[in-house]
Amino acid sequence: MNTGAEAVETAIKLCRKWSYLKKGIPENQAKIIVCDNNFHGRTTTIVSFSSDPDAYSDYGPFTPGFIRIPYDDLPALEKALEDPNVAGFLVEPIQGEAGVYVPADGYLSRAAELCKARNVLFIADEVQTGIARTGRLLACDHESVKPDILILGKAISGGLYPVSAVLADDDIMLVIKPGQHGSTFGGNPVGAKVAMAALEVVKDEKLAERAENLGHVLRRELRAINSPMITLVRGRGLLNAIVIKPTNGREAWDVCLEMKENGLLAKPTHGDKIRFAPPLVITEEQLMECVEIIGKSIATFC
């Protein structure tokens, strides 16, 4: 496919078709569990299960067939899985748009186990977290989890060309027969070659290891900024965020505007959080320059 949203839509279709043909769920009764504060794209079906008014307002009527539960809440997942018509659990290993919310250790592995016990597909949306961003090739690798369906995009082509992908074993993937699904530019030779080259660079230049090491540096230096405006630093690898406490009438948006004036681009998400996802090829020197700008910009308001 081309975009992350298109890949998510494909995964939803694949999951539903599998549930009817393999699991035996009655026709048109399949449900997919999703999480509060999710972000999986902007198509009508995907915004149908969003909890963000900015994403779904005025776009109804919405697509049915989704159960939304709190993120990082295993008891809630276990309860939702009691429904015999649940076909899949669609989850971000780290919620990026929500403000880089990293779940508790063991959440993903236990969630995958619960899904397996109920014959429910564990679907990992790694469009934001995949391809070395979090310090592993996949964020699921931090807990040695192999998803039943894996969704990739963005970095799979190094940001050069629109490429996305859905991966699954044959038992799942082959429920869709030739002619039952397609994408105008999906699988085109240029896109495929670009993705292959990008993955070779990730491997050869050890970008996952770089992200892991530089992520520790970034979080350490951000925590060293002495400012009451920064109430929390969190992240994994080179996917990080700070939580901003409004101070003297200034908020996260004002901090971003000041950073722009000082030479660094970032944006707030969910109001009080600023996300930092620098290029995986960033040097430590450049990273320290970014931290200096962040500290200088925040100091303007305190």
Locations of the language-model features?
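Conserved N-terminal phosphate-binding loop of PLP-dependent enzymes in the Aspartate aminotransferase
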Residues: 1-302
